[in-house]
Amino acid sequence: MKVYVIDYHKDDPKKCTGRKLVKLKLAELTRVGRGIILNPFSERTLSINDKDILIKSGITIIDTSWNNTSQNEFKNVRGEHRRLPILFAGNPIHYGIAYKLSSLEALMATLYILDEMKEAIKFSNVVKWGHTFIELNKELLEAYRNKDEEEIKKIEKEIIEKILRK
């Protein structure tokens, strides 16, 4: 399974998990999207139906800053764009905030949802807080794991409605 990173150099280099993956040779730096493109603005939600894409072509993470990102950074990247369902950041910068995942967290979530848990756990060892993300989202990740897009959207909708009722 290949992991690619498109780095827009908008993040603090010391906190950039995409660059860390490249530095550790766990990902390859690229300018071209390949396979699944993790895109928080995508209308399509990642699901088990995307596993063949992961196996054949890999996954591309677009590494940018949440503080100044826009759809334009994702729009021109070729590939199969997918967004992740609701999950909560376990990283120290955005801890507990829905959808604001680091590149590494997005990768771990993708692998977990696509039933590649051993790989997800392997990547969680890259940073001190990697296991925090998995533990914080364990119930959600298990609910999404191995599900098709419609099932995941239904689960996500129920979770959001539950949060809004509180």
Swiss-Prot record:
Predominant location of this chain?
cytoplasm
Protein family per UniProt: Belongs to the TDD superfamily. TSR3 family.
Q: What would be one Gene Ontology cellular-component term for the protein?
A: cytoplasm
Question: Which residues are involved in binding S-adenosyl-L-methionine?
Answer: T17, I62, L84, Y99, S103
Q: Name one GO molecular function term.
A: 18S rRNA aminocarboxypropyltransferase activity
Which EC number applies? 2.5.1.157
Q: What is the lineage of its organism?
A: Archaea, Thermoproteota, Thermoprotei, Sulfolobales, Sulfolobaceae
Function noted in UniProt: Aminocarboxypropyltransferase that catalyzes the aminocarboxypropyl transfer on pseudouridine corresponding to position 914 in M.jannaschii 16S rRNA. It constitutes the last step in biosynthesis of the hypermodified N1-methyl-N3-(3-amino-3-carboxypropyl) pseudouridine (m1acp3-Psi).
Please state the span of the N-terminal signal peptide per the UniProt entry. none
UniProt keywords, alphabetically: Cytoplasm, Ribosome biogenesis, rRNA processing, S-adenosyl-L-methionine, Transferase
Please give the catalytic activity noted in the UniProt record.
an N(1)-methylpseudouridine in rRNA + S-adenosyl-L-methionine = N(1)-methyl-N(3)-[(3S)-3-amino-3-carboxypropyl]pseudouridine in rRNA + S-methyl-5'-thioadenosine + H(+)
The Gene Ontology biological process terms listed for this entry are: enzyme-directed rRNA pseudouridine synthesis
The record, for HAMAP family, names:
TSR3 (MF_01116)
NCBIfam families xrefs: PRK02287.1 (NF002621)
Entry annotated with the keyword Transport:
no
| Cystine bridges | none
Cell compartment(s), UniProt:
Cytoplasm
InterPro entries noted in UniProt: RNaseL-inhib-like_metal-bd_dom (IPR007209), Tsr3-like (IPR022968), Tsr3_C (IPR007177)
Instruction: Please report the name of this protein according to its UniProt entry.
Output: 16S rRNA aminocarboxypropyltransferase
